[in-house]
Amino acid sequence: MLCLTFTNRAARGMKERIDERFTDRCMDTLYVGNLHRFCSRLLFDNDVVSEISTILDEDDVHDVIEGLLIENIPGGSRGRSLPGNAADYIMARSARLFQEANGFPEETFHRTPEFDVNKKNQDELDAFGLIKVDDFGRCIELDHAAIDAAARRYLEYKTAQHLLDFNDLLLKAWAWLDATPEACGRYAWIQVDEVQDLSPLQLDIVKKLWNDSIDRSVCVYFGDEQQAIFSFMGAKLDTLRALHKTHEIHRLYRNFRSPDYLLNMFNTYAQRVLECDPEFLPKAEKTVARPEGALRAIRTATPQSQLMLLCDLLEGRRPEETTAVIVPSNREADAVSAAFKAQDIEHFKISGSDIFRQNILKAAKAYLSVLKDDFRSAPWAQLVYRLSSKKNLSLKKIRDYLAVEFPRRGLLASDLMLYSTHDEKEPVSALEDFMRAYEGELVVFDTETTGLDIGLDEVIQIAAVKLRAGEVVERLVLYLETEREIPKMLGNIPNPMLEEYEAHRAELVTPEAGFKIFLNFVGYAPVVGHNVEYDANIVNAQYAVLKDQLRRVRGDAAGPDEDVDRTELVRRFDTLKLSHALEPAILKAAGLARLPSHKLKDLIAVLGLEGSNTHKADDDVEATVSLLRWFHAQARPLVELQRRFLSNPSVVRMSDTLRKIVLPMFLEHRNLMYRRMPAADEAILVQVFRQFIEALPNYTDDEGEIENIRKKLPLIYEYLDRVLINTTSQPTLYAQLQRNLVQINSLKEPDLCSSDIVRDRVFISTVHKAKGLEFD
């Protein structure tokens, strides 16, 4: 089953209604959300896009396109700023070019928004080389050749930098589904809300997902022709008319929300102005006498007198009711807000620059992203840019450094912060650190477990190989007792550990004995693994529980048992991270333009190395050793290049900024990543988010910005804690980031208003931002 709607707010409302009616745990697997987020999951889960890909928001798209245009203008853009609608136009053209090049049906082609040259934007467009003038200077129009050239550069740049905009989520999902017939028809039941707001491309994606070949398959669309508010995004009434021809129509006539006096007014407007057939207009269930003063059209002489009248009208409202002042534009919303402030009328304004687009919030969201995946360069670039008080480098320039120049030298963006550029005796990167460790003693290890929950699941197999200067000197394989059920399937394949575990049942050791043997085998050597954070943390977590249990049995008075209370896996190297540092070398050796993924099995396959990823720890360790040796051979010539490059003053400034502001918090929060927190406490993710934001005033010139949003920050914290994050099912920071980060990155201010955390009773909003909200 698949439940799709248009906005995060609508999806949350739909999920709440489902949870109220159904308590079955299988509902947790039901996808409820908007189509863009669904397509994002589809692309990442199926390795259609690189796991390091980053989704751009509107501001990022504007910055990228403006930066690309500036690079191609002799002498720069003369201090001009690219109009936002020009960036939108170029992005739309790039989507259209992608569709034309990839065989999309013409009816799904992306709609290019209307955009013309006028007196307000002429100078800016001219500065960016986007208009052409005839010989007499009288005929000025868009230079469509220049527009398309910019659109193509934008497409190429996104590919090179592993960037996606919101159009890409739909375009790449459609292209993959079209090229992969076996992936289509996954769902026997699909319901789509607000269908009038979906574009032909979105509807075609839904059709590809629906399995209409089985009995009782259902695809139901909910919508209203009169609510096509997002027509500027490509939604068309023609789409609804096409559905009328292929689907059975059910009209819902009973309106349970609006009182009859209000609905009658809307129906009159629909009939007389929109020329709707009265037969299809809804009937009100509520018969309510029109309150005094309701449904009035009031003429005022001046804009100022209108504002004063609004203030007077609000004095007579009921204090417990929510009141919305809906205006056409952000400018008018600002004027109303200023008038209310002058009259001490408490209110919440949804307009202008969304709070989640403010510098401080963008920095905080980038911090959460690098905390979850520290090998992705785009959030690091965002973090460096947002924290730099003097903005010496543009966001695009920083992104180019981290996504292009760093990989050429085997550097990770995280190296900027985790390693110092000032001490010649210390390593400057993860790769150099690994190279030094490789010359000594390393332990390559892997675990197999009963599941992925570090706090609850248990280790059932440990395999390890000890290397000295790259040569194998010792091996270890252990099978540990467990009372937990071993899963029968790993995703869509049978779990090989079921048979393996039974075959070695006679060799089982207790978890306590197994961990003692393994940790004594490791000693104080660094450990290596593919996605080693998971393996190291489940060992540390389970062993910590065993040590605590043993202490309670021994009694606090007993001294520490050296055999038990010895060590934990602290210093570790991750071949998953190293594979990102060496990706250019891997691609060159494999003759590929893009890796299928950074999974162990794919890396072994494309490089033709010995070993196989069978999901049995001993096999996986041997494969990791093969990979490790290949990495060592590739890394040696890169280390000197790294040192020269990292001495660049621009790179040093970026490193110093991160190490001064972020490093202490990052190390603290990373140590909390897998620690289970009490469900009654504020979500650990919210604590981390708050700590990061509260640390910023000491390091940024944007104190005015912080004051502007200070009122709304507590609402954001409360929203994340009470509405978004479920600490019962997500007890660790890692689980909370894994489950909620995508939604946090897509939050908008109106999302706060659709919950009960906003105590203000008066709201100011533009028409478009109020869609989906309800007021008394």
Tell where the protein language model's regions lie, with residue ranges.
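P-loop NTPase Walker
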Residues: 1-51, 181, 325, 770
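Conserved helicase NTPase motor core
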Residues: 2, 10, 31, 59-65, ...
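ATP-hydrolysis module of ASCE/P-loop NTPase motor domains
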Residues: 29, 48-143, 161, 255, ...
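Conserved helicase core region in the C-terminal RecA-like lobe
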Residues: 33-39, 190-194, 222, 329, ...
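Helicase P-loop NTPase motor core
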Residues: 247-248, 255-345
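ATPase/helicase motor core of nucleic-acid motors
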Residues: 317-428, 599-609, 618-619, 623-676
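Accessory C-terminal helicase-associated subdomains
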Residues: 376-443, 451, 466, 649-765
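Conserved non-catalytic scaffold segment of RNase H-like nuclease domains
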Residues: 440-443, 450-556, 591-597, 601-606, ...
